[in-house]
UniProtKB/Swiss-Prot annotation:
It comes from Gorilla gorilla gorilla (Western lowland gorilla). Belongs to the ABC transporter superfamily. ABCC family. CFTR transporter (TC 3.A.1.202) subfamily. CDD domains: ABC_6TM_CFTR_D1 (cd18594), ABC_6TM_CFTR_D2 (cd18600), ABCC_CFTR1 (cd03291), ABCC_CFTR2 (cd03289). Residues 1386-1480 are annotated as: Interaction with GORASP2. This is Cystic fibrosis transmembrane conductance regulator. Monomer; does not require oligomerization for channel activity. May form oligomers in the membrane. Interacts with SLC26A3, SLC26A6 and NHERF1. Interacts with SHANK2. Interacts with MYO6. Interacts (via C-terminus) with GOPC (via PDZ domain); this promotes CFTR internalization and thereby decreases channel activity. Interacts with SLC4A7 through NHERF1. Found in a complex with MYO5B and RAB11A. Interacts with ANO1. Interacts with SLC26A8. Interacts with AHCYL1; the interaction increases CFTR activity. Interacts with CSE1L. Residues 81-365, 859-1155 form the ABC transmembrane type-1 domain. The gene is CFTR. Its EC number is 5.6.1.6.
Length: 1480
């Protein structure tokens, strides 16, 4: 960045903002880069501002019981705020004084006041000076207030971030990431521009009082008629505003429904294409869009009438103010024109400035209160450590994740002791304790000496991670003692990578030691990986390490923990992403050798690790199942394998455990209050929803760590009756909305499921910050596209014969990615706050305007209609103004007024009252035409938005994957969320305002030019200057806004990054470093925003300066060229004053239109994307109709001769696949053939191209060569027909928000009987029947209530329903429990017995039934043969497979020889495998 010219700027340069000229000149000539932006002044740095506010807030906390954040802000910013407020008031006062001078100028043309004619020129000079003074006062004041608002936002940004790093884990479990982002964006953004309006809460009343006093002097009591009308109008607008809010709230839910489905479609676009669901998804989204648009139109109509009421209220204000006076005392032109000028200012103060000021204060105080509540949340408390101790000890430790359970625990014990004394009931305490919820850890005892290794094992949800959290101090024990030195290093289960180099991630702020660093790199097997990078360990990693594989991220996280010199190392399942060989080497070299003298606690379930551990702690349901050595474990606990593997079924849990699971699940799987569920119809009802439960569930958030043991209150306990009720003041659930907030405040969009018929259960959830920290987010990506994490679920019980409790318990142990439909993950969050600069020009091109206008043919006619109405209005206005300017004056001798009252001509003749009749008629006509003139325009523009959304949706669905791979998912979603919201909400009204203002200005100029032709000569250069100035400024301003948006992104991504690694940050004590990084991100954004505000004020000031020159010319031309008669000069000067404010408004509106039209440009860019195939008629099958000979889905009503494919024979010839056209080949010259009904297994190492081959079969990539199915080439039929020949079970399971029926049969072509039959075949019937509504049960959030196994069965059912002859399976057994895996194998044998099956699988057992194997290596087919031939001595396959796996392939060879001995085997740690970019 460059040094700012502001530092050396003179006072005059600062006053006129001339110091911004270099950046404006550069932006006009070339594209601006970040290096062109000026550095911020030191007073605006985040360090200084945050320190200042933090000092005052600490002072407030220390001095009062009820601290107020507004007091801290007042001490920091109040006096500067008031200083600029006084300047703003003085500038507004000049607006009230100007009509007085105008009246005196008009009066000087009265024939009876010829002696004052000589001072008219001086009055004109005074009037011009008032405009100059107003300009010099208002713009510095407005800029100063914007500057203060910016500083307040920066200071509170920093304060919130620092508080976030201090929050306890319990609090983080109750706060969603959406709340934090909303706190930092929606709330704090109100200070930036809203602060300039805040002063009008006192300026507007003072101004109204001053104006009413001046109008009273002119019109006496009739002045209050106009004021009364304005007050009624303000109330009317307030009513319209409330109506608009109602429609907006209703519409918000519909928008969110559409965005949920759209985001799911975008994230799973490859699956949508593989299933041929383009038409179904398009129809589903368009139906939601149709419902949304009905409410959009209603809200737009209300906003339109609200805007129109302001524009056309001026006629009635003047009319109601003047009429009573004129009826009594006659028409006085001076008073009419003076009153018109007063009423213009009065109308703005009453109907705009004061309501906006009140709204600003309401929103700002609300935001301050929210921030204040957040700043008073419970903080993370560091445990007291003994630095001299060398051992780690836990004695009788019990802990709850729920805040306050420790106090409830102690209260229950006390009550129990009291009752035992009086009643002697020993069991009472334990019954009360069961009501309080299950502890996450209970009575934990262990002791390890320095240098020992403690292995902690247990099933999912047993409390392993919670144990580490308690040692770190993240979880406070309710009772018991913890003892250790406090020098801790931590490696999280889910790898966390901060933005920076590999070296910076490993060192992480610790002093650099070359020898130690190299030793750690070697021990963690990172040498080979680092050597492959050109920059070695100085390669910069993106946020989350998106350029690394899962194994690389895991090893870097482990290296970071090992590099720190600590006494105690906490390793939470660090080997989850590593292959067996790498895991073994790292465990030996790193854990056992490099850290041999250190105390280590390793969470693992690997038998090899347990054998080498000094001590073993096995947890089961939060309790210590075993503690001792491995030999003791084998002797004392021979059944420990089941506890270790987590094979307990739900029915085997204790009654207390089952109750905790059920209530916790219901907490999180909350029911919509208005869901049409008839519980009385369900005999299997196992719970009741009470009012207390309804309130509690609103605040529930899934925490995978303690999901089984968290407590949910269904009924009030005795302790609650005594007033001990937890979380009674917790704020209601809030989410981050994808829809831009309106000017009235933020819109919190409720999560509403897709509409369906029949009994439904609608569910919603949100993600807590703690959940974000503990998510296993899969970060697989391809060379062009970063995909969103797929959802992974782990089952607690077998997948068949489930009870209703089992169904709901599936929600507990899931490991799910943060979905964009609910909360936005870090990559999508970045996308949602700025758009890529891409190829969109800085200024919207005329071609975009032309295309927009011609989208809907009627739009052109509507614009012509508006122009015709405008011409009629101008003509009517000319008639009235001509009458006022040329009304014959009454003879002085017949005047009823004395000399003292004749400052202006008075028209009292009865015949002259026709002026009023004409004025009333014209006013009524203008009101009618004005109110309804723009309505067709707004209606048509919303229709245009509807058409553009439809075209863009169709274009995205039909676009090839090679094009979609070059786009980011967040960017695509932005088009459907932010840009469509702009087209729906902002653009129609902004275009209407601009056209309205432009026509008003043109009309006023036309009237002035008719009355005084000389003025027209001065108007032409002014208009030219405006156009040139606008073009000059627009080039730079749009670029600065783009840079500002881009600079906003790091703020929020840094917040999410910090939250995901918060436990690591605290363990390493790196909070100050991350605060510094956050301040740098704030300063970067501030530099762009401050420069944008400065250039905007430069532009606004230049506009006023041009107009001041114009007004000076108009004033002197009218004064010097006008003869007798005050009417004409009054009209000219009044209209000139009106032109000033209106033209500025029009120019600003034109800039807004240009900015909003950039959204239209982006939408057109998506519409213009290439399509996969030429448009063809729908190939949707009909159950009772004959189809063409090229058939896709087999149908019992169709003759066999018409069915294709009939056998499933495939021939692949010279197949080459590329991700993008012209890119490197991923597969080269693949040739082989598959016989009908044959089963082929794909073999190869990770990244060899197995999943890519399956994608190539579906033509999802750029392909060359030929594939034939039953003799039909893929070039001879459409893509839809080709893809429907395949059944697909993808690696990334796709469950969209909708009913079971919709997910299984989106085209609604099968009957319930047929769907149930298939559900029986795949083992889903027992699962679906447990849900209320059965097939009509609404699944949300990617099927959050289903395990991963259930979702795989859903995909299997889809393939069975499709009756495809070729089945593609991409890692179908990944993360499946044995029961579901057996169901899939059985279904493949039965339902697909005569189908061709192509299987990509890592499990050797899954390959047993394949007749042929295709070995892929280095993107080519190396071998294609039977398993027997592949296992010969020369085979590459034989070299890759271990001897034990060979035995598994042929178990019959050894089964008869000897009976295998029972062995104790451990299940692999339940973590997500790395998902590759080529997955289906």
């Amino acid at each position: 960045m460059q040094r700012s010219p502001l530092e050396k700027a003179s006072v005059v340069s600062k006053l006129f903002f001339s110091w911004t000229r270099p950046i404006l000149r550069k932006g006009y000539r070339q594209r601006l880069e970040l290096s062109d932006i000026y550095q911020i002044p030191s007073v605006d740095s985040a360090d200084n501002l945050s320190e200042k506010l933090e000092r005052e807030w600490d002072r407030e906390l220390a001095s009062k019981k009820n601290p107020k954040l507004i007091n801290a802000l007042r001490r920091c910013f109040f006096w500067r705020f008031m200083f600029y407020g006084i300047f703003l008031y003085l500038g507004e006062v000049t607006k009230a004084v100007q009509p007085l001078l105008l009246g005196r100028i008009i009066a000087s043309y009265d024939p009876d006041n010829k002696e004052e004619r000589s001072i008219a020129i001086y009055l004109g000079i005074g009037l011009c000076l008032l405009f100059i003074v107003r300009t010099l006062l208002l713009h510095p004041a407005i800029f100063g207030l914007h500057h203060i608002g910016m500083q307040m936002r920066i200071a509170m940004f920093s304060l919130i971030y620092k508080k976030t790093l201090k929050l306890s884990s319990r609090v983080l479990d109750k706060i969603s990431i959406g709340q934090l982002v909303s706190l930092l964006s929606n709330n704090l953004n109100k200070f930036d521009e809203g602060l300039a309006l805040a002063h009008f809460v006192w300026i507007a009343p003072l101004q109204v009082a001053l104006l009413m006093g001046l109008i009273w002097e002119l019109l006496q009591a009739s002045a209050f008629c106009g004021l009364g009308f304005l007050i009624v109008l303000a109330l009317f607008q307030a009513g319209l505003g409330r109506m608009m809010m109602k429609y907006r709230d209703q519409r918000a839910g519909k928008i969110n429904e559409r965005l949920v489905i759209t985001s799911e479609m975008i994230e799973n676009i490859q699956s949508v294409k593989a299933y041929c669901w383009e038409e179904a998804m398009e129809k589903m989204i368009e139906n939601l869009r149709q419902t949304e648009l009905k409410l959009t139109r209603k809200a737009a109509y209300v906003r339109y009438f609200n805007s129109s009421a302001f524009f056309f209220s001026g006629f009635f204000v003047v009319f109601l103010s003047v009429l009573p006076y004129a009826l009594i005392k006659g028409i006085i032109l001076r008073k009419i024109f003076t009153t018109i000028s007063f009423c213009i200012v009065l109308r703005m103060a009453v109907t705009r400035q004061f309501p906006w000021a009140v709204q600003t204060w309401y929103d700002s105080l609300g935001a301050i209160n929210k921030i204040q509540d957040f700043l008073q949340k419970q903080e993370y408390k560091t445990l007291e450590y003994n630095l001299t101790t060398t051992e780690v000890v836990m004695e009788n430790v019990t802990a709850f994740w729920e805040e306050g359970f420790g106090e409830l625990f102690e209260k229950a014990k006390q009550n129990n002791n009291n009752r035992k004394t009086s009643n002697g009931d020993d069991s009472l305490f334990f019954s009360n304790f069961s009501l309080l919820g299950t502890p996450v850890l209970k009575d934990i005892n262990f002791k390890i000496e320095r240098g020992q290794l403690l292995a902690v094992a247990g099933s999912t949800g047993a409390g392993k991670t919670s144990l580490l959290m308690m040692i770190m101090g993240e979880l406070e024990p309710s009772e018991g003692k913890i003892k250790h030195s406090g020098r801790i290093s931590f490696c999280s289960q889910f790898s966390w990578i901060m933005p920076g180099t590999i070296k910076e991630n490993i060192i992480f702020g610790v002093s650099y030691d070359e020898y130690r660093y190299r030793s750690v790199i070697k021990a963690c097997q990172l040498e080979e990986d680092i050597s492959k990078f050109a920059e070695k360990d100085n390669i910069v990693l993106g946020e989350g390490g998106i350029t690394l594989s899962g194994g690389q991220r895991a090893r870097i996280s482990l290296a970071r923990a090992v590099y720190k010199d600590a006494d105690l190392y906490l390793l939470d399942s660090p080997f989850g992403y590593l292959d067996v060989l790498t895991e073994k080497e790292i465990f030996e070299s790193c854990v056992c050798k490099l850290m041999a003298n250190k105390t280590r606690i390793l969470v693992t379930s690997k038998m090899e690790h347990l054998k080498k551990a000094d001590k073993i702690l096995i947890l089961h349901e939060g309790s210590s199942y075993f503690y001792g050595t491995f030999s003791e474990l084998q002797n004392l606990r021979p059944d420990f394998s089941s506890k270790l593997m987590g094979c307990d079924s739900f029915d085997q849990f204790s009654a207390e455990r089952r109750n905790s699971i059920l209530t916790e699940t219901l907490r999180r799987f909350s029911l919509e209050g208005d869901a049409p569920v008839s519980w009385t119809e369900t005999k299997k009802q196992s719970f009741k929803q009470t009012g207390e439960f309804g309130e509690k569930r609103k605040n529930s958030i899934l925490n995978p760590i303690n999901s089984i043991r968290k407590f949910s209150i269904v009924q009030k306990t005795p302790l609650q009756m005594n007033g001990i009720e937890e979380d009674s003041d917790e704020p209601l659930e809030r989410r981050l909305s994808l829809v831009p907030d309106s000017e009235q405040g933020e819109a919190i969009l409720p999560r509403i499921s897709v509409i369906s018929t029949g009994p439904t259960l609608q569910a919603r959830r949100r993600q807590s910050v703690l959940n974000l920290m503990t998510h296993s987010v899969n970060q697989g990506q391809n060379i062009h596209r970063k995909t969103t994490a797929s959802t992974r679920k782990v089952s607690l019980a077998p997948q068949a014969n489930l009870t209703e409790l089992d169904i709901y318990s599936r929600r507990l142990s899931q490991e799910t990615g943060l979905e964009i439909s609910e909360e936005i993950n870090e990559e999508d969050l970045k996308e949602c706050f700025f758009d890529d600069m891409e190829s969109i020009p800085a200024v919207t091109t005329w071609n975009t305007y032309l295309r927009y206008i011609t989208v809907h043919k009627s739009l052109i006619f509507v614009l012509i209609w508006c122009l015709v109405i405008f011409l009629a209005e101008v003509a009517a206005s000319l008639v009235v103004l001509w009458l006022l300017g040329n009304t014959p004056l009454q003879d002085k001798g017949n005047s009823t007024h004395s000399r003292n009252n004749s400052y202006a001509v008075i028209i009292t003749s009865t015949s002259s009252y026709y002026v009023f009749y004409i004025y009333v008629g014209v006013a009524d006509t203008l009101l009618a035409m004005g109110f309804f003139r723009g309505l067709p325009l707004v209606h048509t523009l919303i229709t245009v938005s509807k058409i553009l959304h439809h075209k863009m949706l169709h274009s995205v669905l039909q676009a090839p994957m090679s094009t979609l791979n070059t786009l980011k998912a967040g960017g695509i979603l932005n088009r459907f969320s932010k840009d469509i919201a702009i087209l729906d909400d902002l653009l129609p009204l902004t275009i209407f305002d601009f056209i309205q203002l432009l026509l008003i200005v043109i009309g006023a100029i036309a009237v002035v030019a008719v009355l005084q032709p000389y003025i027209f000569v001065a108007t032409v250069p002014v208009i030219v200057a405006f156009i040139m100035l606008r073009a000059y400024f627009l080039q730079t301003s749009q670029q600065l806004k783009q840079l500002e948006s881009e600079g906003r992104s790091p703020i929020f991504t840094h917040l999410v990054t910090s939250l995901k690694g918060l436990w690591t940050l605290r363990a390493f004590g790196r909070q100050p470093y991350f605060e510094t990084l956050f301040h740098k991100a704030l300063n970067l954004h501030t530099a762009n925003w401050f420069l944008y505000l400065s250039t905007l004020r430069w532009f606004q000031m230049r506009i006023e300066m041009i107009f001041v020159i114009f007004f000076i010319a108009v004033t002197f031309i009218s004064i010097l060229t006008t003869g007798e008669g005050e009417g004409r000069v009054g009209i000219i000067l009044t209209l000139a004053m009106n032109i000033m404010s209106t033209l500025q408004w029009a120019v600003n509106s034109s800039i807004d239109v240009d900015s909003l039209m950039r959204s239209v440009s982006r939408v057109f860019k998506f519409i213009d994307m290439p399509t996969e195939d030429k448009p063809t008629k729908s190939t949707k099958p009909y159950k009772n109709g004959q189809l063409s000979k090229v058939m896709i889905i087999e149908n019992s009503h169709v003759k066999k001769d018409d069915i294709w494919p009939s056998g499933g024979q495939m021939t692949v010839k010279d197949l080459t696949a590329k991700y993008t056209e012209g890119g490197n080949a991923i597969l080269e010259n693949i040739s082989f053939s598959i016989s009908p009904g044959q089963r082929v297994g794909l073999l190869g190492r990770t990244g060899s191209g197995k999943s890519t081959l399956l994608s190539a079969f579906l033509r999802l990539l750029n392909t060359e060569g030929e594939i034939q199915i039953d003799g039909v080439s893929w070039d001879s039929i459409t893509l839809q027909q080709w893809r429907k020949a395949f059944g697909v079970i993808p690696q990334k399971v796709f469950i969209f928000s909708g009913t079971f029926r919709k997910n299984l049969d989106p085209y609604e072509q099968w009957s319930d009987q047929e769907i149930w039959k298939v559900a029986d075949e795949v083992g889903l019937r027992s699962v679906i029947e447990q849900f209320p509504g059965k097939l009509d049960f609404v699944l949300v959030d990617g099927g959050c209530v289903l395990s991963h196994g259930h979702k795989q069965l859903m995909c299997l059912a889809r393939s069975v329903l499709s009756k495809a002859k070729i089945l593609l399976l991409d890692e179908p057994s990944a993360h499946l429990d044995p029961v579901t895996y057996q169901i899939i194998r059985r279904t493949l044998k039965q339902a697909f017995a005569d189908c061709t099956v192509i299987l990509c699988e890592h499990r050797i057992e899954a390959m047993l039934e394949c007749q042929q194997f295709l070995v892929i290596e280095e993107n080519k087919v190396r071998q294609y043969d039977s398993i027997q031939k592949l296992l010969n001595e020369r085979s590459l396959f034989r070299q890759a497979i271990s001897p034990s796996d060979r035995v598994k392939l042929f178990p019959h060879r050894n089964s008869s020889k000897c009976k295998s001995k029972p062995q104790i085997a451990a299940l692999k740690e339940e973590t997500e495998e790395e998902v590759h970019d080529t997955r289906l």
